């Protein structure tokens, strides 16, 4: 088992102690918030490092006892059993520390733009898109996050042809980023009289909320059109040109927003979505190149990839990237067991990162 970077851990512990000392002095409100937030992020790693070093010292004591020729057989047997337990605990702590030291995605703490679109399957696909949105909405509530619908186009029988929402909460992108891709549902629709199982699909895109400083958008690269907002039948629903369509000419990305009566609000919402999509398009390109080199199953950035199947007759959910099946479909759709899938995907991604660094997961 390769060693941990002890010098790096010493620096980490010293920095943690320095932050704690700063809190004992006089600090402003904003600085207090920054320090306490950094401490809360460092605390799990610091505790693991301290526990690892305690176990390492205990192992040294046990080894000394085993090497002592005067140790009797009964004491030796007890020491060997203790050594096995300490060795296993040390291995767990080393893995925990290595994972904690992995490079963090700069966007992990950001809010999320969640986009869900009905795919193949007509009305049933729209209903499924609605089910997915409610699943994420309930999951967000369990995390203490908030969800605000930015734009929605309802299906003729319910659900959504398309819905865009902002998920606000610390670590939202870290939790939801592996949800992007094609989600497939297999079930008997309410309108099906023969009892046949239909297969439908919806596409989910999870984009980090991007700030102006993250993406350089030149005014000359934008084509902005204004128009009167239209209802479902194509009729104009107000007399002012409040609807906005923004085209980013270099990438061809188009965002249209008409949900607000305020052109200013529609424009701001459209620009937020545009920034996220431009950033995401570049990240997809980089992720695809990276995953092709590493043959990663998770985080490939391929939005056309079928990632998960929800089979209602069998009550199961299967994530195809990691071959994980849970017979907890009602709990997953209710947002309660979705975390189990997300945690498994995160673990797989971390294992790939560790393998890339030359460590066994």
UniProtKB/Swiss-Prot annotation:
Its main location: cytoplasm. The keyword Flavoprotein does not apply. The modification N5-methylglutamine is found at residue 235. GO terms for cellular component: cytoplasm. One of its GO terms (molecular function) is translation release factor activity, codon specific. InterPro entries: PCRF, Pep_chain_release_fac_I, Pep_chain_release_fac_I_sf, Prokaryotic/Mito_RF, RF-1. Methylated by PrmC. Methylation increases the termination efficiency of RF1. Keywords: Cytoplasm, Methylation, Protein biosynthesis. It is found in: Cytoplasm. Peptide chain release factor 1 directs the termination of translation in response to the peptide chain termination codons UAG and UAA. Belongs to the prokaryotic/mitochondrial release factor family. NCBIfam families: prfA, PRK00591.1. This is Peptide chain release factor 1. The gene is prfA.
């Amino acid at each position: 088992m390769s060693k941990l970077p002890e010098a790096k851990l010493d620096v980490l512990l010293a920095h943690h102690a320095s932050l704690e000392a700063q809190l004992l002095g006089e600090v402003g409100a904003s600085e207090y918030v920054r320090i306490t937030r950094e401490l809360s992020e460092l605390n799990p790693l610091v505790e693991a490092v301290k526990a690892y070093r305690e176990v390492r010292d205990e192992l040294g004591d046990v080894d000394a006892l085993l090497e002592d020729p005067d140790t009797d057989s009964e004491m030796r047997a007890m020491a060997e059993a203790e050594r096995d337990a300490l060795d296993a605990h040390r291995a767990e702590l080393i893995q925990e520390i290595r994972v904690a030291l992995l490079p963090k995605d700069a966007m992990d703490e950001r809010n999320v733009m969640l986009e869900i679109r009905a795919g193949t399957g007509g009305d049933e696909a729209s209903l499924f898109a609605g089910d997915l949105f409610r699943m994420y909405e309930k999951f967000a509530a369990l995390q203490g996050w908030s969800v605000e619908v930015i734009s929605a186009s309802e299906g003729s029988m319910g659900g959504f042809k398309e819905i865009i929402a902002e998920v606000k909460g610390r670590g939202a992108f870290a939790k939801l980023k592996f949800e992007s891709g094609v989600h497939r549902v297999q079930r008997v629709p309410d309108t099906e009289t023969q009892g046949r199982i239909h297969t439908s699909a919806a596409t989910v895109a999870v984009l980090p909320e991007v700030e102006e400083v993250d993406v350089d958008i030149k005014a000359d690269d934008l084509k902005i059109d204004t128009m009167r907002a239209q209802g479902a039948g194509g009729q104009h629903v107000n007399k002012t040109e409040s609807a906005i369509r923004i085209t980013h000419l270099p990438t061809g990305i188009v965002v249209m927003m008409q949900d607000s009566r305020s052109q200013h609000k529609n424009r701001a919402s459209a620009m937020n979505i545009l920034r996220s999509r431009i950033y995401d398009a570049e990240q997809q390109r980089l992720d695809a190149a990276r995953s092709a080199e590493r043959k990663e199953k998770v985080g490939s950035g391929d939005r056309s990839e079928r990632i998960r199947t929800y089979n209602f007759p069998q009550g199961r959910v299967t994530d195809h990237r990691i071959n994980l099946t849970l017979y907890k479909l009602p709990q997953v759709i209710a947002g309660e067991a979705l975390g189990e899938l997300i945690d498994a995907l995160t673990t797989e991604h971390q294992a790939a990162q560790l393998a890339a660094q030359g460590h066994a997961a």
